[in-house]
Amino acid sequence: MTLSIRHDWTTEEIQTLLELPLMELLWEAQTVHRKANPGYRVQLASLLSVKTGGCEEDCAYCSQSIHNSSDVTAFEAQMQVEPVLQRARAAKEAGADRFCMGWAWREIRDGAPFEAMLEMVRGVRGMGMEACVTAGMLTDQQAERLAEAGLTAYNHNLDTSPEHYDRIISTRTYQERLETLERVRKAGVTLCCGGIIGMGETLRDRASMLQVLASMNPHPESVPVNGLVAVEGTPLEDQAPFEPLELVRMVATARILMPHARVRLSAGRESMSREAQILCLQAGADSIFYGDVLLTTGNPDVEADRQLLSDAGVTANWQEETAAPVNCSPR
């Protein structure tokens, strides 16, 4: 059955979805999810911090900002290419088929670190894995070079709604985020774009953020749904923990709005019970970050995730055949 894809959702419509009785919301999300994802497969993605700390941005949630005082804000040198590729091989052997690499940068700058990034992307793609990069803002030319290297997706999150955004970050505008996403899309690289709940936003803010995502045409290929991990030394260190069922609601609503996007269960999962995580899978999450660290915060370990997926009765890509390598040699 063909799903109706919309790009004209209003914030009011989305808030109405978020406010539905939970069982009704789950039923609607399940109906969409089973049509869009009949095999009910969950993609396993691994995430590595290639360059940690020293970021010039002042994101209130982030342990890597020079404006905050967590234990990881100091500058660390970028990892070399081969150790990164070794981690990618290990991730593949553990079952991941998408390898995401993070740089704590405000923006990509031309030079040796960017050339190394391109080599990493080519190496990951040569293993038959999807490659995703998150490294801040970039130019048209940089986006084109990443596309030529074979980059599958570029992650650049909205974080929150346009209305709540200034309470979370002041060093980059919302419009700059949207312009970065447009450059990535223009280069032919798919978008990985989502946000975070639990940062003091209202339900209306959550609906507004989802409205921005659902208005994109096409929808993002991947939509990470994060719950705040309150890190000591950041402005949000004393923020009350998010309610797990609120994250379930965000997953379900994202699935209804963007039927074919990968809704990725991301940061904050470590604080959720197995039952809440299974509800997220039922609600439409079809990807998880896999491994015990997400950049600088914790995540359930590999064996726990395998058991979780097995108990939930969903098929993960680690049970499938290995993908063929992709030749992404420099032109």
From Swiss-Prot:
Query: What is this enzyme's class at the first EC digit?
Result: transferase
Which EC number(s) does the record attach to this protein? Answer: 2.8.1.6
Q: Which residues cross the membrane?
A: none
Q: Where is the Radical SAM core domain?
A: 40-269
Q: What are the recorded GO MF terms, alphabetically?
A: 2 iron, 2 sulfur cluster binding; 4 iron, 4 sulfur cluster binding; biotin synthase activity; iron ion binding
Q: Which GO terms describe its biological process?
A: biotin biosynthetic process
Q: For binding [2Fe-2S] cluster, which residues are annotated in this chain's numbering?
A: C100, C132, C192, R264
Cofactor note (record) = Binds 1 [4Fe-4S] cluster. The cluster is coordinated with 3 cysteines and an exchangeable S-adenosyl-L-methionine. Binds 1 [2Fe-2S] cluster. The cluster is coordinated with 3 cysteines and 1 arginine.
Annotated positions binding [4Fe-4S] cluster: C55, C59, C62
- Catalytic activity of the protein: (4R,5S)-dethiobiotin + (sulfur carrier)-SH + 2 reduced [2Fe-2S]-[ferredoxin] + 2 S-adenosyl-L-methionine = (sulfur carrier)-H + biotin + 2 5'-deoxyadenosine + 2 L-methionine + 2 oxidized [2Fe-2S]-[ferredoxin]
**Regions annotated as coiled coil:** none
HAMAP family according to UniProt? BioB
Quaternary form?
Homodimer.
Q: What is this protein called?
A: Biotin synthase
Its source organism is Synechococcus sp. (strain CC9605)
